[in-house]
Amino acid sequence: MKKWSILAAMFGVCLALPSLAQAQSYDHGEVGVFADYFRFDRTTPDINFVGVGGRVSFNVNPNVALEAEMAYDFKRNFTNTFSDGITTTFVPSNTRPLHALFGPKFQVGSSSPVRAFVTGKVGLVSFSTSSASPGAGFKSAIAGVSNGDALFAVYPGAGVEGFIGPIGLRLDVGDEIYFDNGARNNLRVTFGPHIRF
C-alpha cells in the first residue's frame, strides 16, 4: 500500500511539472519603483525636481499593457534674485509636484529580455507648496488634488527595459505636458527596478 502511495505521488508530480513550468511565464504584468527627474520649464531659471514613484501595469496582450503610476517630487529650494538697484533679495520656494498618470504602453520585443516601448498617458499634476517634512508634504499634495488644485496632464514618452528572469530595470524619457493657460512642456525621466509577474 505504501509503495502505491509513493508511486501515485510521483506520477502526480510528473503530471504537474509541465503546467508548473508553463506557469513561470512572466507576461502578466509589472510592478516597480523609480527615481523621478522632472524639469519644470515654466520658471526662469528652470527648476530640476527629483523624487520617487511607483508603477503597476497589467498586460492586455503581449505587446500592450495598461499602466498607472504616481510620483512625488521633494521640495526644491531654489533662489530667484530680485534687484531694485540697491539691494538683492533671495526668495526660496518649497514647491512639490505630485504626478498621477494612466495609459497604455506599447512594447516591442515582448518575448526577449530587452524591450523598447512607447507610451501615452493622461492624468494630473499638482503643485503644492509646503515647508513641512516629506511625509506631511505628500499628504498636503494629495489634499491639494481633492481640493481641485490639480492640472490636466498628458505624457508622451518612450523607453527601454531589460529583465533577467522576473527582475529588471526600466528607463523612461518623455514630455509631461500640463495645461495652465496653455500647454506647458516639461522633461521627465524615470529610472528604477521592476518585477514581472
Model regions: which residues?
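Cleavable N-terminal export/targeting peptides
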Residues: M1-Y26
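Surface-exposed extracellular loop regions of Gram-negative outer-membrane beta-barrel proteins
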Residues: G157-L171
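Short N-terminal segments immediately surrounding and downstream of signal-peptide cleavage
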Residues: S25-R42
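Gram-negative and organellar
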Residues: A23, A100, S140-I142, A158
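Low-complexity, intrinsically disordered Gly/Pro/Thr-rich segments
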Residues: V173-Y178
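Short catalytic helix/loop segments, enriched in acidic residues and glycine
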Residues: F49-S57
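Gram-negative (and chloroplast) outer-membrane scaffold detector with strong preference
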Residues: G32, Y37, S57-G137, F152, ...
